[in-house]
Amino acid sequence: MKRSIKHIYLLSDATGETVERVVRAALSQFRDVEARFHRVTRIRSREDVIWALEEVLREPGMVVYTLVDTELAQLLRDEAEAHGLDAIDLISPLLFKLSDFFGEAPQKEPGLLHQINSEYHKRVDAVDFTVKHDDGQDPRGLAKADFILVGVSRSSKTPLSMYLAHKGYKVANVPIVKGIDPPPELYKVDQKRVVGLIIDAERLVQIRTARLRNLGQMPKGSYADYERIEEELEFCRRLYRRNPQWLVIDVTKKSVEESAAEIIQKLAG
């Protein structure tokens, strides 16, 4: 015998994402049940509460709600009871317990959790973008980057990019190789979003030598050769001089955090 579909109304003072996730998690414990969700969001006034319940009464079902305003939550409880509706308050009992536990009243500001979730998803998207645009990958995506870092190999492009990504910025980085022009897409974006990284030659020799040893290789050849590195850096400097709109940062004595702070202050501040 086919079960009838039950209606569940999700009422929220924000987007309703939180209440829906909780209800779906609870429903996963039940087999062979069918539910149709109806979201009613942005409930911020008494009129909104009354209108929401009128919507519920068109095709009655269970009401599950998250309203941080205690007066609106009480109004919804009273009206639901008056109409014989099952209504479950997901957040008020928790707010009361937390208030007692911490000895502090809640802010009662709608949408705070959604704001936190949005910031989290922004960081996730930024990290995903940055990974996909590391070391010159997919130059077509440079236009979507908040910052574009350029510099020679081992000049902190990747760690700096990832640090900024965890701050919520989409970052691409492009390697500068002596004698090879950067991709043309680099010059089609807002040039004030491009950051040129420069580093002292001796410090770069140390970094590249350590890198080779970590890979089990002898520090021979041009990769860690001082004169070769000086030539690479001079090629970089000439490129930066030809593009005066780029922000140039010397990372020799700066930590990743310090370099990131300078970029954010000068380009996003």
From Swiss-Prot:
Catalytic activities: N(tele)-phospho-L-histidyl/L-threonyl-[pyruvate, phosphate dikinase] + ADP = N(tele)-phospho-L-histidyl/O-phospho-L-threonyl-[pyruvate, phosphate dikinase] + AMP + H(+); N(tele)-phospho-L-histidyl/O-phospho-L-threonyl-[pyruvate, phosphate dikinase] + phosphate + H(+) = N(tele)-phospho-L-histidyl/L-threonyl-[pyruvate, phosphate dikinase] + diphosphate
InterPro entries, per the entry: Kinase-pyrophosphorylase (IPR005177), PPDK_reg (IPR026565)
Binding site for ADP: 151-158
The EC number(s) this enzyme carries: 2.7.11.32, 2.7.4.27
Keywords per UniProt: Kinase, Nucleotide-binding, Serine/threonine-protein kinase, Transferase
One Pfam entry name: Kinase-PPPase
Family annotation (NCBIfam families): PRK05339.1
Protein role: Bifunctional serine/threonine kinase and phosphorylase involved in the regulation of the pyruvate, phosphate dikinase (PPDK) by catalyzing its phosphorylation/dephosphorylation.
Family stated for the protein in its record: Belongs to the pyruvate, phosphate/water dikinase regulatory protein family. PDRP subfamily.
Key word Nucleotide-binding present: yes
Lineage: Bacteria, Pseudomonadati, Thermodesulfobacteriota, Desulfuromonadia, Geobacterales
tRNA-binding in keyword set: no
EC primary class: transferase
UniProt protein name: Putative pyruvate, phosphate dikinase regulatory protein
GO molecular function: ADP binding; ATP binding; phosphotransferase activity, phosphate group as acceptor; protein serine/threonine kinase activity
